[in-house]
């Protein structure tokens, strides 16, 4: 016997979270909980403002329609990426497809004073991989900060993310301030320039490896082995169903590319599922999931070791 609940939620964010020039004051989303007999599965639907095609309200309408269809015995998935991902996660838990084993390691997101970062990163146990957002300030400053971190910590590798912020000139200004001897320890730089051709040229000219992120969601993108391209960054909330995520990971691996499962600032429930997906589909590759600290609370399922308060399901607004 099938049954389902849908919950709506809103989590206050830390004051400094800015996405595409918009301050993100709250993270808004939905949960679906599916039951079939004794089995249960959860999924999170949380479109990311400025990045998702769909709004929270559109996702809610699509989710409620899909849940009612599922209760009638239909097995298809919705089209909207965030709804398809959340619904497929709930089904994967319900059927036991999504393994319980998780990779709760996270490449720490580096913000704040560079001198403080050096101290924090130097004390990191094990493999030292960290992420730095670039393109928010002057390119020269970004280059100097990256160079400082790589110089101060000889075993540090950095993942950089520019979100297509730079013109070719700005990208070259950044590279000019990174010692060529350190560039091999830039694991990859996500989408440095506004166009793929400019990003490819940057990689060829500087020897700094790049990764595709936004490109994966463009209609004309195809997976290819290209000079200077080392990785793809897959954000399941923006991608679609678990099957589509699996297809992208498999396509990347077939070309020898690194596939990184990455957060779209999901709640703790969604992040713990992404940690399981990463352990399942990209074992041995550190996922990019260090976003929980941007929020003021957890929900339903806590992230191991987090001190943030965790709301229970009966504290959420139920829609169905």
Swiss-Prot record:
EC number annotated for this UniProt entry: 4.2.1.113
Keywords from the UniProt entry: Lyase, Magnesium, Menaquinone biosynthesis, Metal-binding
Annotated organism of origin: Salmonella agona (strain SL483)
Function: Converts 2-succinyl-6-hydroxy-2,4-cyclohexadiene-1-carboxylate (SHCHC) to 2-succinylbenzoate (OSB).
Reactions listed under catalytic activity: (1R,6R)-6-hydroxy-2-succinyl-cyclohexa-2,4-diene-1-carboxylate = 2-succinylbenzoate + H2O
Alphabetized InterPro entries for the sequence: Enolase-like_C_sf (IPR036849), Enolase-like_N (IPR029017), Enolase_C-like (IPR029065), Mandelate_racemase_C (IPR013342), OSB_synthase_MenC1 (IPR010196), OSBS_N (IPR041338)
Pathway(s) it belongs to: Quinol/quinone metabolism; 1,4-dihydroxy-2-naphthoate biosynthesis; 1,4-dihydroxy-2-naphthoate from chorismate: step 4/7; Quinol/quinone metabolism; menaquinone biosynthesis
Cross-referenced NCBIfam families: menC_gam_Gplu, PRK05105.1
Active site, per annotation: 133, 235
Protein name: o-succinylbenzoate synthase
């Amino acid at each position: 016997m099938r049954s389902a609940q849908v919950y709506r939620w809103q989590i206050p964010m830390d004051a400094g979270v800015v996405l595409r020039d918009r301050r993100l004051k709250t993270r808004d989303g939905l949960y679906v909980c599916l039951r079939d007999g004794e089995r249960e599965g959860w999924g999170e639907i949380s479109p990311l403002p400025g990045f998702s095609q769909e709004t929270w309200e559109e996702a809610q309408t699509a989710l409620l329609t899909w849940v009612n269809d599922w209760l009638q015995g239909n097995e298809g998935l919705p089209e909207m990426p965030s709804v398809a991902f959340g619904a497929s996660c709930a089904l994967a838990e319900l059927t036991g497809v999504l393994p319980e084993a998780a990779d709760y390691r996270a490449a720490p997101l580096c913000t704040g004073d560079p001198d403080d970062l050096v101290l924090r990163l130097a004390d990191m146990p094990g493999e030292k991989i960290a992420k730095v957002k670039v393109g928010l300030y002057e390119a020269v400053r970004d280059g100097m900060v990256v160079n400082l971190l790589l110089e101060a910590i000889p075993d540090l590798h950095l993942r950089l993310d520019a979100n297509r912020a730079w013109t070719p000139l700005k990208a070259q200004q950044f590279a000019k301030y990174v010692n060529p001897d350190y560039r091999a320890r830039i694991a990859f730089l996500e989408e440095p320039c506004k166009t793929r051709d400019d990003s490819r040229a940057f990689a060829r000219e500087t020897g700094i490896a790049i990764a595709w992120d936004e490109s994966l969601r463009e209609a004309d993108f195809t997976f290819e082995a290209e000079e200077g391209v080392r990785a793809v960054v897959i954000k399941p909330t923006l991608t679609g169903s678990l099957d589509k995520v699996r297809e992208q990971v498999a396509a990347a691996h077939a070309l020898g590319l690194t596939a990184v499962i990455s957060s779209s600032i999901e709640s703790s429930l969604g992040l713990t599922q992404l940690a399981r997906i990463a352990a399942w589909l990209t074992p041995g590759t550190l996922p990019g999931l260090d976003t929980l600290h941007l929020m003021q609370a957890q929900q339903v399922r806590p992230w191991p070791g987090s001190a943030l308060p965790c709301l229970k399901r009966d504290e959420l607004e139920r829609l169905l």
